[in-house]
Amino acid sequence: MALPWYRVHTVVLNDPGRLISVHLMHTALVSGWAGSMALYELAVFDPSDPVLNPMWRQGMFVMPFMARLGVTDSWGGWSITGESVSNPGLWSFEGVALTHIVLSGLLFLASIWHWVYWDLDLFRDPRTLEPALDLPKVFGIHLVLSSLLCFGFGAFHVTGLFGPGIWISDAYGLTGRIQSVAPAWGPEGFNPFNPGGIASHHIAAGTVGILAGVFHLNVRPPQRLYRALRMGNIETVLSSSIAAVFFASFVVSGTMWYGAASTPIELFGPTRYQWDSGYFQQEIEKRVEESLSNGLSLPEAWSNIPDKLAFYDYIGNNPAKGGLFRAGPMNKGDGIAEAWLGHPVFQDKEGHELIVRRMPAFFENFPIILVDKDGIIRADIPFRRAESKYSIEQVGVTCSFYGGKLNNQSFKDASTVKKYARKAQFGEVFEFDRTILDSDGVFRSSPRGWFTFGHANFALLFFFGHLWHGSRTLFRDVFAGIGAEVTEQVEFGVFQKVGDKTTKKQGYV
């Protein structure tokens, strides 16, 4: 009998041995992909400038996940923090990649073994010798094992008790490094930006899960509940597993897009809301004001701003600026950042200090408008053929730079002033090399954007998959043709009485 493509998985529905086999093969493929992808990323990754050319600008996808768990060094002698290292050993990018590839091979062999030796005594009821799985017991075993892993991660890996710790940084993504974390047991542990919550929540969830697993190993479900939720049917397992996966996928889509301690901006890039709210702009202005109050001059104050902080305050690093159909890393869009040119300050001939109104995230084009401190428009770059009374030439706008490569330089030429006004619309002004990667000048999204897009979409698909398989398992008797009038316990695929005249039915008067 030929099966259509969407029905092929029925061949493992009542075959536990081969069901294990295909799951082992799937895990082998995932592990092999992860290891191979890591090696590919290492082959194309340029570690030379961790400030202006970090991994998220280069479109690295699996490297940030390794880095946040404590893998920062390479056999090539470099570290993502910019230091040189020697003999990092197995706990390195290459070591983890090769470990995954070796694991993939072992899982592949295990899959073949289970496909060949599919009819194990383990899958038969010892009393009746009929094929049977004790699914509530299997659930208890899996819950205990996964909870032990969860508890161990929180209690040992994250805390540094037996492990490296995790990636910890300040609120502005400047001082990131691997360090151990103390669990946060108070209300502060519920702050998604508090890394202490990662440790405490894994310890708590692991503890609860271990207790729940022991419970399910020792306590049988009530018969009514067992039948109501079809606990003897493997499709119930599929349905509830899909529910767990899509829920987790929605959660991580949120923590990635909105930001959290588990998705640091140094590894995944800033969030769109940090551009929308002027998050980095406010911090830069605050630091400049503090420097000025300490007696420094304007050029000195701006020179104290780290390039890393200034680079975050640039619209090209906003993950919402990249279209979903623009493939490639951020560097393929605006180019490889080479230097911060400095902070441009504009002034008209009347002495008003002007700032360029910044482009909102969802605009592809936005008028170049220069406003004073009161928000009054003083100058602009008019559209072609438009009447102009605020043009750069008429208003006599000049541009001075503080900090960066052009520190303390001024420009009066109208074409140069216009050039920097256009750049200032995008935040802090940077110099990019677009020749190395043949960059096309069209913004791309960061790994933060791609991760969110992928997981939100798959979560939606899996949500419908949960409904589909849940309804199939709950209403299997109806779909199989066993009517409500049938009083004898019949199960499709077990008895041959479905539709049989001898099957007892409820009589009608």
Swiss-Prot record:
Any single GO CC term annotated in Swiss-Prot or TrEMBL for this entry: photosystem II
The note describing how and how many cofactors are bound reads:
Binds multiple chlorophylls. PSII binds additional chlorophylls, carotenoids and specific lipids.
User: Which GO biological process annotations does it have?
Assistant: photosynthetic electron transport in photosystem II
Keywords attached to this entry:
Chlorophyll, Chloroplast, Chromophore, Membrane, Photosynthesis, Photosystem II, Plastid, Thylakoid, Transmembrane, Transmembrane helix
For this protein, the record's InterPro entries field holds: PS_antenna-like, PS_II_antenna-like_sf, PSII_PsbB
Where does this protein reside within or beyond the cell?
A: Plastid, Chloroplast thylakoid membrane
Briefly, what is this protein's role? One of the components of the core complex of photosystem II (PSII). It binds chlorophyll and helps catalyze the primary light-induced photochemical processes of PSII. PSII is a light-driven water:plastoquinone oxidoreductase, using light energy to abstract electrons from H(2)O, generating O(2) and a proton gradient subsequently used for ATP formation.
Report the family membership: Belongs to the PsbB/PsbC family. PsbB subfamily.
This chain belongs to the protein called Photosystem II CP47 reaction center protein
Phylogenetic classification of the source organism = Eukaryota, Rhodophyta, Bangiophyceae, Cyanidiales, Cyanidiaceae
Gene name tied to this protein = psbB
